[in-house]
Design a protein with these regions (language model features):
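A short linear-motif detector with a strong N-terminal bias
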Residues: 51-56, 83-86, 226
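Alpha-helix initiation/capping motif
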Residues: 2-5, 26, 82, 170-171, ...
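Acidic/histidine-rich helix-loop elements
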Residues: 17-25, 77-85, 117-123
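Short, acidic Gly/Pro/Ser/Thr-rich loop/turn segments
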Residues: 14-15, 83, 114, 195
């Protein structure tokens, strides 16, 4: 049977990373590890910093494709992109050239959409719907299945009165849930799942998931780092696992059944 492809569109929290930025890792870089895998060929041209995947046929160099037993995961997410700037740069047009009948388009945006200081990225929640519909319609026009993924939670416990984590970009999450209901599109509420998970691991535990790095621990970050938005490998692995679990438990309809069947 011909393999289908899951395409990922999103931002830095989804992106696959190459050297020398280790250990920053997007959840899209680890998602393949939760599916039935064929034996991986390592260190192919364009692979990620762990040696997995290879350059996809995208016109954009950061895109990396992973092969599993029954499908491909083509990660076309890119740091700093919102639903607006991703579209404006022609990245959706590039994706449209590849996506075909039976494929999936998973999209996670909000981190950059909510940034009012970056005019080229910012969209209001109402505009967010307009842009997401462009992705949804692009998939549907090619008989592919669009899937909405709410944005992962940030490490915001230092900024809340009770030291608890909260759902990030709630207006955009609410709008995405509304879009899912309105247009009958599957929604994977990764934002809520990651918020719940972070409240379980707590303040100190969350530092091992995000880019909190000691000085000298990594060549690319000699001065260390305290980054509450981006994930290191352990965080990307955990969050990808939450996404896989949400796919497995999805029961609103049968639109994700083909993906479920490939989970390990």
């Amino acid at each position: 049977m011909k393999k289908f492809t899951i395409y990922l569109a999103g931002d830095s929290t989804v992106q696959s990373y190459k050297t020398p930025v280790k250990p920053i890792t997007g959840w899209g870089q680890m998602l393949h590890t939760y599916f039935k895998e064929t034996e991986q060929k390592m260190n192919q041209d364009g692979c990620d910093w762990m040696g997995y995947g290879k350059k996809s046929d995208s016109d954009f160099d950061q895109s990396i494709i992973y092969e599993t037993d029954g499908m491909f995961i083509d990660n076309r997410a890119m740091a700093g992109r919102s639903s607006r700037s991703y579209f404006d740069e022609g990245r959706l047009d590039d994706l449209k050239k590849a996506i075909k009948s039976g494929d999936y388009l998973f999209m996670q945006f909000a981190h950059n959409d909510a940034n009012k200081e970056k005019e080229e990225r910012y969209v209001t929640p109402e505009q967010y719907e307009e842009y997401l519909l462009r992705y949804i319609n692009a998939a549907k026009e090619r008989d592919a299945q669009p899937v909405l993924v709410t944005a992962i939670a940030m490490r915001d416990c230092d900024d809340t009165p009770d030291g608890k984590f909260s759902v990030s970009f709630p207006e955009y999450r609410d709008k995405m849930l509304e879009i899912g209901d309105k247009y009958d599109i599957p929604v994977i509420d990764l934002g809520k799942a990651t918020d719940d998970y972070l409240n379980t691991v707590g303040d100190e535990g969350s530092k091992k998931l995000f880019m909190w790095l000691e000085k000298g621990a990594y060549e690319g970050y000699p001065d260390g780092k305290q980054d509450n938005a981006h994930l290191q490998q352990a965080g990307a692995k955990a969050f990808a696992g939450l996404l896989a679990g949400l796919i497995r438990s999805y029961d609103r309809d049968d639109k994700l059944d083909k993906v479920k069947a490939e989970l390990a």
